[in-house]
């Protein structure tokens, strides 16, 4: 267990102030395009493809959560070579969970393996975001 903790603490961390937010699960922190680990947010409008429902609410929530200083710990590189990470800020000790808890994004279980199940259950049970009225 100590070896696992040492390895987790040895993984790279990037930091930035007021990152540029692309959508509800992607931001730019310095030179790195960061995909939030375990988070799946609706896509914003791209070209002729219209925005998915709640895409801009998810983006705005991530903007709110990333005001000020942000740090992201590396998890892996995805197939697009993006830095996939677990992020925190002055506004939240766990941005990934907070976006899911808002109800505007869901857990990306294929990768997270249930790491954010509690956050998603909270969003559902309280009827937040896209869970409202369900």
Which residues are covered by each model-predicted region?
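Small beta-barrel nucleic-acid-binding modules, primarily SNase/OB-fold domains
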Residues: 2-134
């Amino acid at each position: 267990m100590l070896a696992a903790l040492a390895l987790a603490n040895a993984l790279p961390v990037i930091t930035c102030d007021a990152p540029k937010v692309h959508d509800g699960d992607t931001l730019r922190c310095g030179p790195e395009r960061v995909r939030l680990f375990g988070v799946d947010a609706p896509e914003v409008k791209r070209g002729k493809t219209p925005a998915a429902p709640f895409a801009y609410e998810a983006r705005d929530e991530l903007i709110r959560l990333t005001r000020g200083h942000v740090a992201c710990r590396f998890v892996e590189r995805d197939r697009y070579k993006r830095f996939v990470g677990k992020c925190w800020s002055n506004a939240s000790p766990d941005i990934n969970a907070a976006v899911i808890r808002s109800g505007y994004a869901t857990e990306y279980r294929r990768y997270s393996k249930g790491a954010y199940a509690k956050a998603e259950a909270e969003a559902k049970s309280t009827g937040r975001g896209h869970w409202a009225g369900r």
